[in-house]
């Protein structure tokens, strides 16, 4: 096991996460409500800004990397805040949530949803837990869902609603002997699966054969910056251990009477020039990130880049409109490094009918 100190340097955290297969977020003091845009309640207890900042960053980075996570007590609250949720600064208690009994003594019940990871772990809709908290999750955030509550409605457990292996519980299973150990066994199993997946990625090459990121170039996206508007960027490729992607120059198909220039955001004379412009922009991205990116044209290039620790970009064209009725342009684009050209896309053209077209030729 690795104990991670409260480190503010994201590079240190990222490098640490590269060596981890699972993450436990432990109990502790209150969170600073300023993280949630709230002013402090008079009933707020001790806070630790340094720990808050480090753990919130840690969760977000681990989330992006699909690392299995278990949050305990404060840890469930850390999960919620980091992933867009909120926490009550001090709960109104109908059930005693800060017991005086021994830590190993369960003192109240928790009702569990049947379609949840927690139900799969315990095979029961109700379990008994211990309780040592005055704060609790109020909103799980858009990435998480509520899977267990106490009888007074306090959220006792949340999990990912995106099929990520993330679970948070408000109680302390580490004090509950064999019953509590079941949750830790779940994390061990998920960490084992994650480790196996990472080892698989080391042995094989993963190639995304189609990426629409260039469609967003007119909106100012940068491939070397994490951007929620696009599904593939350099950071997401790294997080997901993806080795290569094929960036396509998508050419919209004008209808009869429409000009091509009216369908695209850049000022170009025709489809070929537009495709060239997209490829120029991709090559500019690669040129600025040579330590991390390379243009690949062959399988040998792909495997060479993987050995060198670089991500590969291959080039493609979506819509044979780019050929401009000249078959010699097939050779031209091949020499530019284009690895495939689809004959059409979402409309009939002079080459063929589209599956979504109007049967122009047939």
Predicted stretch roles:
Residues 71, 75, 80, 84:
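Gly/Ala-rich beta-loop-alpha elbow adjacent to hydrolase catalytic centers
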Residues 33-48:
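Glycine/threonine-rich flexible loop motifs
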Residues 55, 360-362:
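Alpha-helix-loop-beta-strand connector modules within alpha/beta enzyme cores
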Residues 22-30, 89, 339-346:
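Non-cysteine beta-strand/loop elements that form the S-adenosyl-L-methionine
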Residues 65-67, 311:
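A short helix->loop->beta-strand "cap" motif at the edges of active sites that frequently abuts
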Residues 196-360:
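N-terminal hydrophobic targeting/anchoring segments and the immediately downstream early-domain regions
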Residues 2-21, 25, 48-65, 92-199:
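Amide-donor transfer/coupling interface in amidating biosynthetic enzymes
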């Amino acid at each position: 096991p690795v104990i991670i100190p409260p480190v503010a340097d994201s590079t240190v955290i990222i490098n640490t996460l590269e060596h981890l297969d699972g993450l436990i977020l432990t109990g502790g003091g209150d969170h600073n409500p300023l993280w949630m845009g709230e002013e402090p309640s008079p009933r707020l207890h001790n806070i630790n800004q340094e720990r808050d900042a480090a753990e919130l960053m840690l969760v977000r980075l681990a989330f992006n990397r699909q690392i299995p996570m278990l949050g305990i007590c404060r840890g469930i609250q850390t999960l919620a805040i980091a992933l867009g949720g909120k926490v009550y600064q001090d709960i109104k208690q109908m059930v005693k949530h800060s017991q005086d009994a021994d830590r190993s003594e369960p003192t109240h019940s928790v009702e569990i949803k049947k379609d949840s990871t927690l139900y799969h772990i315990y095979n029961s809709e109700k379990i008994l837990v211990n309780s040592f908290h005055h704060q609790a999750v109020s909103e799980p955030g858009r990435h998480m869902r509520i899977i267990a509550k106490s009888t007074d409605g306090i959220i006792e457990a949340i999990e990912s609603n995106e099929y990520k292996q993330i679970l948070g519980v408000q109680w302390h299973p580490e004090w509950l002997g064999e019953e509590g150990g079941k949750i830790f066994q779940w994390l061990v199993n998920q960490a084992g699966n994650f480790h196996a997946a990472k080892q698989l990625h080391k042995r094989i090459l993963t190639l995304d054969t189609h990426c629409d990121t260039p469609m967003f170039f007119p909106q100012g996206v940068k491939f070397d910056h994490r951007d929620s508007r696009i599904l593939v960027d350099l950071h997401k490729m790294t997080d997901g251990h993806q080795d290569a992607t094929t960036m396509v120059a998508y050419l919209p198909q004008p209808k009869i009477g429409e000009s091509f220039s009216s369908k695209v955001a850049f000022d170009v004379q025709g489809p070929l020039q537009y495709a060239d412009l997209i490829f120029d922009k991709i090559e500019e991205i690669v040129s600025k990130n040579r330590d991390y990116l390379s243009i690949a044209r062959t399988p040998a290039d792909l495997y060479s880049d993987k050995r060198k620790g670089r991500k590969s970009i291959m080039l493609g064209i979506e819509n044979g409109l780019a050929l401009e009725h000249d078959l010699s342009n097939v050779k031209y684009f091949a020499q530019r490094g284009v690895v495939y050209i689809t004959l059409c896309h979402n409309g009939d053209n002079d080459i063929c009918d589209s599956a979504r077209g109007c049967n122009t030729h047939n």
